[in-house]
């Protein structure tokens, strides 16, 4: 049995030993050996004799071990030094065992293991000016603990303020890279878009280059033995100067589905959120070129998008009383194929009592675009809308449940022709493909819609008029927007 087989068997055994509940609590999942090997092979050769490797959040140590073997077996490096950091003492036996397997065979291998919080060690390493040539990580995916004051204090001192543990690890790790260092990480795709990660993306893109992204087609394949359904990417960051980014979209761990893109096709200079786009093929460039020529945005149209303010499980003013002063609640089940159907779902308490507290949760009678927040990559469409018209209101106000977003103008409705034009645009196939480039979430965020280039108000209203009057028979809807 070779070393990699032994390491993989140790990972499988650790998975059985460590309670799944604990793994899910910290959302830390051990990397299978085929993925660990693939990640290690993304690193370029290292010409210097001595190479330093960091495995932060090492778990059972298989990533750092397999990465070390790559360089030990290359014959080009006289000395390989691995630093592994893992806070969970229950994993130390497996971590030490995997490291020992390599030490037994290679005399030019040195390993340091820290049973410490990575934030604490990272602060120490950065203070001492220590850096690494190669860093490989599969960090925990959990949110930042608001109760761990020691961690929060360290992150504050280091000026790290990302919303998630994995993004903290990425930021600290690229700061620990040597001059031509490389970082390979397997992480959720969620950092690519959304306003919560805007500051993180801007800092990352300023300090390192994205050399490689591998997006798995299925959300279920990567960590299937753990029942993880997040969309996951492997990303390679480097401090070297590069001109192109290689993108692979496949469940297979090879280069057969890879294409190279210019860096300005991955991120756009005029995007205030610095979204990271993951094009699926070169044909996507036609989509980008078409949409990027549009001159407006939701904000420039004078429109806003808000999330429904009724959170059902904690709303104390829900009622079954169908009084005219109470507001009907709009739920996501009411949104069906561009339409609103209020007959399809009637919970036991479908109204919200109107009072001084709930008034601000209500929208006045008018025309709105309603957008479902929950949206999976497997769905036929990522943006699922419905037109809420004045006729749907059987009273002066309505309210929107939290699983929906709605587009409005100064908290009121829109002109009917604008509603139809904007809804048609959001439902274009080309817009769907554009959104899929950057949104890997299980939901469509308000910021996703805000970041979309839009036609100007005149075009939207003109198309809306044609749709209302059914005068678009000679053209496809897309042609009405893009063939001027």
PLM features per residue range, with description:
Residues 1-76, 83-101, 122, 139, ...:
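Class I S-adenosyl-L-methionine
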Residues 24-25, 29-38, 58-65, 79, ...:
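Signature of N6-adenine DNA methyltransferases within the class I
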Residues 47-49, 74-79, 105-109, 127-130, ...:
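Short helix-terminating capping/connector loops at secondary-structure junctions
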Residues 51, 133, 368:
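Conserved acidic residues
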Residues 52, 81-83, 112, 184:
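A structural signal for isolated positions on well-ordered beta-strands in alpha/beta enzyme cores
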Residues 102-108, 203-207:
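Short, conserved catalytic or adaptor-binding loops enriched in Gly and charged residues
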Residues 107-118:
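Conserved SAM-binding strand-loop segment of SAM-dependent methyltransferases
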Residues 286-483:
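Polybasic, glycine- and aromatic-enriched phosphate-binding surface used to engage nucleic acids
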